[in-house]
A protein has these predicted regions:
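Glycine-rich active-site/cofactor-binding loop and its immediate structural neighborhood
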Residues: 145-146
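An acidic, Gly/Ser/Thr/Pro-rich helix-cap/linker signature
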Residues: 3, 7, 19-140
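Short glycine-biased active-site loop of nucleotidyltransferases that positions the nucleotide triphosphate
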Residues: 160-162, 323-324, 421-422
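Short, surface-exposed glycine/acidic/tryptophan-bearing loops
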Residues: 102-103, 160-181
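Extracytoplasmic and endomembrane cell-envelope/extracellular-matrix remodeling and assembly machinery
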Residues: 75-121, 127-128, 139-140, 184-187, ...
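Hydrophobic h-region of N-terminal signal peptides that target proteins for export
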Residues: 12-19
Length: 423
């Protein structure tokens, strides 16, 4: 039996930062096993619940993706036998295994059935993101089929945010992102940066493979966290095959690997199911410049004449439309034909509406007023000094504050216990 040896420092950091599965919708699957049938309820990944209209709301999608005139997705979805699915999956040029069973079939049917318009959108959105994914995965020597993991995570929606707080194409949780170098604060969230998040995801996946040496376990851990996977392995008696620990996994994670296999299938064989990619126009070329001072998107839009939504789409990591260049040099991405305009007009841009857009004060003065109020402990002198008098009277016993407010000592101890454990 293969044993999994986990580096303690790496695993401890990751365990503190992994996302937890959150159910969105469920699907029923009938599983046949040794002549018997059983009903399996699986929670769907949230990405499979996004309506196509919401995916098309992104600025890039609005401007570069449309339904197309020459090719439209048919409502007719051909039915194929299990043997055909098995053959097609086995012929895919992948390092990761792509096995077939009733659960995988259920997810294939969903992608090629009621989610076929979503697939048509994602096929087009691949033109924006797949080159980024493939470069990072190839650099780290990872299987290129992992490029379809964001299909399960976010449906290639760069603005996706889960109820658990995961964000971006790769749905990084806040702490996981920080461990892998993604800055997050009130103004910046690099989990939303497609390029930086992709390279962070590649490092994370490589670290997970160093632990498990099994890609099914790696992508399952990406969904529910290595702590949950390790617990499932222990409950399964030390087995390290995803399908053998399947029943010990959370409901959503049970569907995560089958959904990943189905995503690889549908992105390869979409034509066999009469799915046509939406028409994609080539986006305008862009370039980056370094910003060393605080800068607001509205300053750029007003002076350079760039569409505000386009600036937001090109720089999704800046949460409040502010590039905080004062803290450290920052990268700003703009259409390439506006780069020279920005450079030539920098002084004008930085000065434009700066007092209106940046209202936080650098220094403040304390009001120079004298108090005329007197207390039992002192009084003001003519020069403004406070003269204190020692009170030598014996103090009366104070009534405990918990008695005053009707709170018991045990209740206070419980609150303190919870606070300590939360901290």
């Amino acid at each position: 039996m293969r044993k999994i040896i986990i580096g303690s420092s790496l695993l401890f950091s990751i365990l503190l930062a992994v996302p937890q599965a959150h159910a969105q919708e469920s699907v029923d699957v009938i599983i046949h096993d040794n002549g018997t049938e059983r009903r399996e309820v699986i929670d769907l990944p949230k990405s499979m619940t996004y309506p196509v209209d919401s995916l098309l709301n992104d600025w890039k999608a609005k401007n570069y993706i449309d339904l197309g005139k020459d090719c439209s997705t048919s409502i007719v979805n051909p039915e194929f036998s299990d043997s055909i699915y098995i053959d097609r999956l086995s012929r895919m040029p992948t390092v990761m295994e792509m096995p077939y069973n009733e659960i995988v079939r259920k997810f294939i049917d969903m992608y090629t059935g009621r989610l076929r318009n979503q697939v048509a959108f994602m096929l087009s959105a691949c033109n924006f993101y797949m080159p980024i994914f493939e470069e990072a995965l190839d650099t780290y020597g990872l299987p290129l089929e992992l490029k379809y993991l964001p299909i399960i995570e976010s449906a290639l929606n760069p603005s996706a945010v889960s109820r658990a707080g995961a964000s971006g194409l790769w749905q990084f949780m806040l702490n996981t992102g920080k461990i892998y170098g993604l800055e997050s604060n009130s103004l910046v969230d690099e989990r939303r940066d497609p390029i930086k998040a992709t390279w962070a995801a590649a490092r994370y996946l490589k670290d997970m493979y160093a632990i498990y040496q099994d890609w099914n376990l790696v992508i399952a851990a990406y969904n529910c966290g290595p702590g949950t996977i390790n617990k499932a392995i222990r409950r399964a008696g030390g087995k390290t095959d995803y399908w053998e620990i399947y029943n010990y996994l959370p409901k959503e994670t049970r569907g995560y690997v089958p959904a990943f296999i189905a995503a690889n299938y549908v992105m390869t064989y979409y034509c066999k199911h009469n799915i046509c990619p939406m028409e994609t126009n080539i986006p305008d070329a862009t370039d980056t410049i370094q910003v060393n001072r605080n800068l607001h998107f509205e300053q750029i839009a007003d002076v350079c004449g760039i569409n505000m939504d386009e600036i937001k789409s090109l720089n999704p990591q800046y949460k409040r439309n502010i590039v905080p260049g004062d803290s450290k040099p920052r990268t700003l991405r703009l259409p390439i034909n506006y780069i020279s305009t920005f450079i030539d007009s920098q002084d004008t841009i930085y000065a434009h509406r700066s007092a209106e857009l940046f209202k936080n004060r650098r220094t403040v003065s304390v009001a120079n007023t004298r108090s005329t109020a007197r207390s039992s402990k002192g009084k003001s002198s003519p020069q403004g000094e406070v003269i204190y008098h020692k009170n030598t009277q014996r103090r009366k016993p104070c009534r405990p504050s918990h008695a005053k407010y009707g709170v018991t000592v045990n209740q206070i101890k419980k609150l303190e216990w919870h606070e300590q454990h939360q901290n």
